[in-house]
A protein has these predicted regions:
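Ribosome-associated RNA-binding proteins
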Residues: 1-125
């Protein structure tokens, strides 16, 4: 589960390396976010190629959670878990900032209507 002040890895080519969760969107009592939720983040570290970076340090963006360490039970009885908590950055309109997502993403994003993120990802689990 992702909550406020959690450090997350960025899995797209927007130029950011790590982000910190500021707010979990989705209601005033919602304290934790899971796979497929949207959160508000601030950029903590950038990748080494700063000239190509589409984002700046300490700026605020929205992000979609694409991988979590918490396991996810599928309908066929299998459990799926990832090794890291990862997000993909998006702009105010909800479109991805990067043009590629590195690593696999979960198929549950397909049910939550994030087709643009699925189309730029490398694989589904």
């Amino acid at each position: 589960m992702i909550q406020q002040q959690t450090i997350l890895k960025v899995s797209d080519n927007s130029g950011a390396k790590t982000v910190r969760c500021i707010k979990v969107l989705g209601g005033f009592k919602k304290k934790q976010a899971s796979l497929g939720d949207i959160i508000v983040v601030s950029i903590q570290k950038l990748r080494k190629l700063k000239k190509i970076s589409k984002v700046k340090k300490k700026e605020i963006y929205k992000a979609l959670i694409i991988r979590t360490k918490i396991y996810l039970k599928k309908k066929n009885g299998f459990y799926v878990e990832f090794q890291e908590n990862a997000v993909a950055l998006m702009n105010k309109q909800g479109t991805p900032i990067g043009t590629r997502i590195i690593g696999p993403i979960s198929k549950t994003l397909k049910k939550k209507k994030f087709q643009k993120f699925i189309s730029i990802s490398s694989g589904l689990v």
